[in-house]
Amino acid sequence: MGAIQALRGTRDILPHEVGYWQQVERVAAEILSRALYLEIRPPIFEQTALFERGIGEGTDVVGKEMYTFKDRGDRSITLRPEGTAGVVRSFIEHNLYATGGVQRLWYTGPMFRYERPQAGRQRQFHQIGLELLGSGDYRADVEVIALATDILQTLGLKNLKLDLNSVGNREDRQNYRQALVDYLTPYKAQLDPDSQDRLERNPLRILDSKDERTKIICQDAPSILEYLGTESKRHFEQVQQLLGDLNIKYQLNPCLVRGLDYYTHTAFEIQSDDLGAQATVCGGGRYDGLVVELGGPATPAVGWAIGMERLILLLQQLQSTPTLTPDIYIVSRGEKAESQGLILAQKLRHWGLSVELDLSGSAFGKQFKRADRTGAIACLILGDQEAENQTVQLKWMTSSQQQTLTQVELLSQLEELKQSFDRHRQSRDD
């Protein structure tokens, strides 16, 4: 019987890669916590109706890409294809709006879409996202954009560009929709099959087509910016002004429409020239009607999601794989020494030092070679004599200096030793 392998469109995040993921999560959590965003953890699967109502039945996500099944109670269940709908459902269900103020929330976790797998796009993929609920102010739009750029720049990403558009309010979009259909209808036979289908049910999505012929046709399409009402136009102008005041560069892209029906007013994407076809690292916008659509009170909101797989592809181009290196590597030989080694390892870990214990039981020479390969700052050596005398040999790996300490002395000098390890660690990292 053959070995079972991971399903197509999924992949294992192996130990040597996990450091990148932890780095992204740590940076995002630090930046978002400083802006008073609180983490929320909705379920991975929800009632299918949540996404049909929230995302829109005419979207590709709902029509083609969702993992939907019946559970044993004959309920229609869907693995979440995105994070916003679940956060909004939780916001409504738990009356988070009752405080009357702004709710700043963020989340991270896996999402699921049945797509053709390629670099940076999997059927199980991961996002970090945020939602700012309760403010229709243009400053909220700029706040979330600024936080996204802060995260990406803190991670060291270069060659980023911010595409910006407004899709207006519902009335603006209805007026524009008709103008777009009137323009595209004479070209229907020349559009790609997906766009021909969208012409009737979701024509704005044609602007986002990747088909070259369709893209050429759309170049001369009317711009949605020409159909914005006074209120929508003012909101968008204020967003642009404040982005400029923050020195956040952007370019207007009237063809930018997000793939989900709930967006209103500001829509944006952050892209990288270093990613090829899958260039979008972050996408988001305002969705003032979604809370009402899902049964809650009228609540303006804005948010975004960062695709972690694509972000990590960029990090891997920028930096070597993050590795864990121990402060101390413990080598021991002999039953009593090996037991004492484990006890010391635990005590040192409790003091905040990273410690690797050699469990091979092999000769000292082989253990020393392994210690050297780990990049450890120091090595603790315990043999029969040390075990008998309750001592250890402390060897600094860079200088080969070695000293004998009683185990009591070692533990009593831990604070001083920690400072020495900090200096060695800083020197090594530099």
Swiss-Prot record:
Q: Which UniProt keywords apply?
A: Aminoacyl-tRNA synthetase, ATP-binding, Cytoplasm, Ligase, Nucleotide-binding, Protein biosynthesis
Q: Specify whether Cytoplasm is a keyword of the entry.
A: yes
Give the protein name, as stated in the record.
Histidine--tRNA ligase
Main location (coarse class): cytoplasm
Q: Which Pfam families match?
A: HGTP_anticodon, tRNA-synt_His
> What family classification does the UniProt entry report for this protein?
Belongs to the class-II aminoacyl-tRNA synthetase family.
**Per the database entry, which stretches of residues form a coiled coil?**
none
**Where can this protein be found?**
Cytoplasm
Molecular function (GO) terms for this protein are: ATP binding; histidine-tRNA ligase activity
Q: Which EC number(s) are documented for this chain?
A: 6.1.1.21
| Record text on subunit structure and interactions | Homodimer.
- Which reaction is catalysed here? tRNA(His) + L-histidine + ATP = L-histidyl-tRNA(His) + AMP + diphosphate + H(+)
Q: What class of enzyme is it?
A: ligase
Per the record, its GO cellular-component terms are: cytoplasm
